[in-house]
Amino acid sequence: MFKSKCLLLFSLACVLFLSGCATDLPRFGFRGKATGPAHFTIDLSDQKACLYRGRTVVFQCHVSTGREGYDTPAGKYHVQQKDLDHRSTVYGAYCLPNRRIVVPDVDVRKNKKPPGTVFIGAPMPYFLRLKGAVGMHAGHVPGYPASHGCIRLPNSAARRFYDAAVVGTPVLIKR
């Protein structure tokens, strides 16, 4: 009985302690009744994206930007293209016609296509093209820069940014 009470008290203390470590990011979703055109900021140092309406941050989330050697370029951009079901033309896998993967994690500029295979581009849902091959899209967000230069967002967040964007939406990427 004493052990179970101690375990319960220890568990509660851990929960209270860890709740103080919670991130200051708001929950996924829009806050308030902010109006005005949307614009986005991407903070490469903090690995964070913010969606603004006017001057108010209405949504923010963690992101994963370009890893070493594939840096996401800082600068001022505008959404050039929206593609709900985009696939990469550079990164993906070489597969047999039945879609069985033969060579994963392919860069078509560096990896020669084996005979009898087809290239299947990596899926990039909710794609917003910013510059050339750089864009924002849903993808794995491990908590550090890990992409080939794009800005990866959690799936639910990518949808929020996609829905808020129009071609021409300003995007500031800062260090």
Model-assigned labels for residue ranges:
Residues 9-19:
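Bacterial N-terminal signal peptides
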Residues 12, 57, 145-147:
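A generic, residue-level signal for flexible/boundary positions that often mark functional hotspots
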Residues 21-80, 87, 101, 174-175:
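Intrinsically disordered, low-complexity
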